[in-house]
Amino acid sequence: TYNKFLNILIKKNFRFKKQKKEDNIYMPRLDTQIHGFIDWNWTAKHIVDFINAFGSPYQGATTFIKKKKYFLNNAKFFKNKINFHPFQSGIIFRKEKNSIYIAALGGTIKIKKVSDTISKEDRIVELKLGSRFFTPLKELERAKQLTSIHSSKGIFNK
């Protein structure tokens, strides 16, 4: 935590290590509303990591069922005996009271929270077995083309 880090600095128990230039990397900042769209062609593990990265305190990773936008949160990866075909990615194949299971490449994705643009309330109860989450290609392409700039005046995408 932040307090632990400060205590280490204050007690001078912190040793700085010079970083090698060849180890440096830079990744631009992201804007959830632009870059938070799920690519259902990815592996289940990559999708789970992506959903959780855009989860709380953010709105969640974005996708659609038909034309309705949903935000997925609280994802868990399961390796299973079923080897889903790529065409099955995004299909809700099991439902429980407070969660849904989605087919994906290399495993299953369990989601515990789904909200929409109207309400932050959980929408799992309204989702149907066999429904398919899908993200239009135009959203995925737009996410890769825009860079977010965060400043004191707000977030700008160029």
Model regions: which residues?
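Low-complexity, glycine/alanine/valine/leucine- and proline-rich hydrophobic stretches
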Residues: 78-109
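A short acidic-to-branched-hydrophobic micro-motif
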Residues: 64-83, 108-120
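Glycine-centered flexibility motif
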Residues: 35-36, 60, 87-90, 107, ...
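Generic C-terminus detector
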Residues: 105-158
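Active-site-proximal loop/hinge segments within enzyme catalytic domains
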Residues: 1-78, 147-158
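Short capping/connector residues at structural and topological boundaries
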Residues: 35-36, 43, 97, 114, ...
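Short acidic-hydrophobic surface loop/beta-edge motif
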Residues: 38, 61-65, 100-105, 127
